[in-house]
């Protein structure tokens, strides 16, 4: 994910699930988002899920085995994709929800059988999807 071969091009679909937050830094994750679009044919679609800091202390977790992206980070990445590759990206849905599953935050050692939100250090995290398509060829 840090060194995508340049000959991997022309694909209709690129997908990752909870992966690019493990590249070691916010910057590395955002670079992956930009680089992965080169793999797509014009009109190809990408879907990536990642960790999203949805609460807790100010700031975020960066330069670690898992990083937590903020809304500002995700919007920056989306802006670069739109500008560089004319990507059409679905709007982010960052609604927290009000149901019991939405409001429950699991804490280490994560005993709950299922959860939507985790306490990671000083922050609350959940998963968010980035969905888009590549525009013109570059």
Label every PLM stretch briefly.
Residues 15-18:
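A conserved beta-strand element that flanks and buttresses the S-adenosyl-L-methionine
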């Amino acid at each position: 994910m840090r060194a995508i071969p340049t000959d991997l091009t022309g694909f209709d679909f690129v997908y990752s699930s909870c992966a690019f937050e493990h590249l070691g830094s916010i910057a590395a994750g955002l670079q992956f988002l930009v680089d992965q679009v080169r793999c797509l044919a014009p009109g190809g679609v990408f879907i990536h899920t990642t960790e999203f800091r949805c609460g807790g202390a100010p700031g975020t977790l960066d330069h670690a085995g898992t990083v937590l992206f903020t809304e500002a980070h995700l919007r920056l990445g989306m802006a670069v994709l739109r500008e560089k590759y004319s990507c059409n990206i679905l709007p982010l849905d960052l609604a927290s929800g009000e149901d019991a599953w939405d409001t429950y935050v699991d804490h280490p050692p994560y005993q709950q059988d299922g959860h939507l939100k985790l306490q990671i250090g000083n922050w609350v995290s959940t998963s968010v999807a980035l969905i888009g398509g590549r525009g013109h060829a570059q």
